[in-house]
């Protein structure tokens, strides 16, 4: 009836009905809505206090903490209160106390933003995520990392090898609470399975995006190999990290899609700003800057410092002030 409120409690589980009932009993059976709301508020206040800011307006602080909240939604806990979870082999496993199983690693979205941040403010979460990816690769017997994990699935969504970046970044920041040798071997396996090895680049379709992102991931493996004292591996992966050069057409002065036979894809009139021209959710003008691991090499390839400054100036000068989706600096998307 009008003015009445209905309070409903629900127990859920990723494992089974018994797990849902147990989760319900342990977490909310004896609590009312106000109690659950307050506990949730307290938990979020605790998590958001990992970063404290000063200055600015109240609106700006709201924007900041809302954004920080968004970085903490996933990867989410995948276990029941009793520690059981579904593993990469689709069987029920029990936590061994070393980590909390988590799910939803949207790799392409998060390796260059969310995870470097979380590695600094919430290393336990990053450790959980890496252990979850490692055990999934182990339990499934695939022995390589998924780029976009969802409920233990190897979805293959998007591109690149983002887990290799997350692993290397975490290791360099002192997050090493996992089987390091196994983690490293799975990184090597991932690069061999998905990478630029065959031709020195990845051919069409989306050849610019694939090649540049694989090259960066290989450089990450090189960094990890060097830190682990694997010098020969480090040299090999540093060389693989230079694969981005194979996508640069000196005649056109920019990165250009390439076919499997080595030929260049036809160059349209608006080649630099044509979306999906060798790139995923972007264009060559945007994706071409993705050489974070070798900026000096990129600058040399592009014609030197002055040429790069001119290109960057043009990129930002043509970016709309509202920062909405556009053909230049597209802050609204990942590349």
In which residue ranges do the predicted regions lie?
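Acidic/polar, glycine-enriched structural segments that form the non-catalytic walls/loops
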Residues: 1-101, 135, 142-143, 181
């Amino acid at each position: 009836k009008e003015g009445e409120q209905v309070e409903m409690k629900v127990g859920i589980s990723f494992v089974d009905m018994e797990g849902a009932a147990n989760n319900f009993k342990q977490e909310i059976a004896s609590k009312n809505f106000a109690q659950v709301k307050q506990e949730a508020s307290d938990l979020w206040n605790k998590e958001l206090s990992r970063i404290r800011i000063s200055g600015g307006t109240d609106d700006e602080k709201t924007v900041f903490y809302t954004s920080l909240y968004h970085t903490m939604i996933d990867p989410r806990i995948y276990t029941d209160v009793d520690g059981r979870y579904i593993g990469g082999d689709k069987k029920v496993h029990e936590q061994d106390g070393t980590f909390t199983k988590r799910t939803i690693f949207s790799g392409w979205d998060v390796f260059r933003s969310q995870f470097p941040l979380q590695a600094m403010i919430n290393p336990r979460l990053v450790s959980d995520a890496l252990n979850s990816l490692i055990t999934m690769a182990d339990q499934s017997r695939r022995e390589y990392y998924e780029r976009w994990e969802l409920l233990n699935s190897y979805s293959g969504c998007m591109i690149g090898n983002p887990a290799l970046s997350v692993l290397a970044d975490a290791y360099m920041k002192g997050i090493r609470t996992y089987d390091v040798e196994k983690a490293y071997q799975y990184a090597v396996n991932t690069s061999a399975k998905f990478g630029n090895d065959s031709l020195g680049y990845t051919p069409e379709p989306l050849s610019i995006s694939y090649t540049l992102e694989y090259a960066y991931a290989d450089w990450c493996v090189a960094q990890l190999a060097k830190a682990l004292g694997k010098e020969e591996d480090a040299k090999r992966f540093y060389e693989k990290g230079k694969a981005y050069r194979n996508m640069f057409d000196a005649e056109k002065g920019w990165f250009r899609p390439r076919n499997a036979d080595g030929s260049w894809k036809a160059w349209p009139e608006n080649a630099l700003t044509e979306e999906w021209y060798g790139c995923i959710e972007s264009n060559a003008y945007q994706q071409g800057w993705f050489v974070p691991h070798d900026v000096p090499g990129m600058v040399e390839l592009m014609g030197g410092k002055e040429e790069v400054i001119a290109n960057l100036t043009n990129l930002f000068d043509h970016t709309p002030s509202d920062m909405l989706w556009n053909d230049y600096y597209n802050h609204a998307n990942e590349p």
